[in-house]
Amino acid sequence: TYMEILAPHIAKKAQPGQFIMLRINEDGERIPLTIAGYDREAGTVTIIFQKVGYTTYALDELNEGDSLLDFVGPLGVPSEFEGLKKVCVVGGGLGVAIAYPQAKALHDMGVEVDFIVGFKNKDLIILEEEFNNACTNLFVMTDDGSNGHKGFVTAALEEQLNAGVKYDAVIAIGPLIMMKVVCDLTKQY
């Protein structure tokens, strides 16, 4: 689920790589969510979440104009991207929501970005148009081949590396096993 929240004080200071903590009501737990985007002029912060527990289901039930009990941020250390000319951002599963602001920030800075995103199937694909606008080259992978190319994001990265594509950095966000394979693939480069 994609949600914009009016929070001018957070939107004003937000940077890629940071997150917020929110709590819906007195009975709710505080949960961290990555800042997927922000609009300083509109004063909005965008979050993306999957309904997996009480808090995210309750969050999904909110309507425009409803309020949250707590919405704190930006928290965390912003990502640093200085001196990069060509980067590959790899996002798998829920990690794509976190990878998106990284790719967008780099692309907005004039960095050439190859963005590899992976999903289980076409029904779980989110933000494809936004991804397309946040990179130079977009590679969509699905485990079952129902959209884009069939296979894992690591196969697309390996194909790029084997083709001689050189990156100043590779940023991987997703399941631990995916990030480990990305690290193993890039060690020799």
What is the predicted role of each segment?
Residues 57-189:
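FNR/FR-type flavoprotein reductase catalytic core
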Residues 1-64:
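Ferredoxin-reductase
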